Amino acid sequence: MAVKERVGTVVSDKMEKTVVVAVETRFPHPIYQKTVSRTTRYKAHDEDNSCRVGDRVRITETRPMSRQKRWAIAEVLSHSPKAAAAEAKAEEANQ
């Protein structure tokens, strides 16, 4: 059986080792043929707490880790420009 994968954007990183990833699906309406977009939010396991809000990530389906968490971060595709600027600013303040 193939492993399910999704690509989405991190919308919340306030939990410990967990992020909320919004995945947008686009499809034509069956009758009117207008493109409809639906957003599904998945809770995903982030072992290193490396994801920030705005990051594009790939998630894969895993065993149940908690009541609502059944996905894990496979890789970070791109970091958010805001998060990168905030990290650089924090690094300058520490020096």
From Swiss-Prot:
SUPFAM superfamilies: Nucleic acid-binding proteins. Keywords: Ribonucleoprotein, Ribosomal protein, RNA-binding, rRNA-binding. GO terms for cellular component: cytosolic small ribosomal subunit. GO terms for biological process: translation. It comes from the Bacteria. Belongs to the universal ribosomal protein uS17 family. HAMAP family: Ribosomal_uS17_B (MF_01345_B). PANTHER family: 40S RIBOSOMAL PROTEIN S11 FAMILY MEMBER, SMALL RIBOSOMAL SUBUNIT PROTEIN US17M. One of the primary rRNA binding proteins, it binds specifically to the 5'-end of 16S ribosomal RNA. This is Small ribosomal subunit protein uS17. It comes from Synechococcus sp. (strain CC9902). The gene is rpsQ.
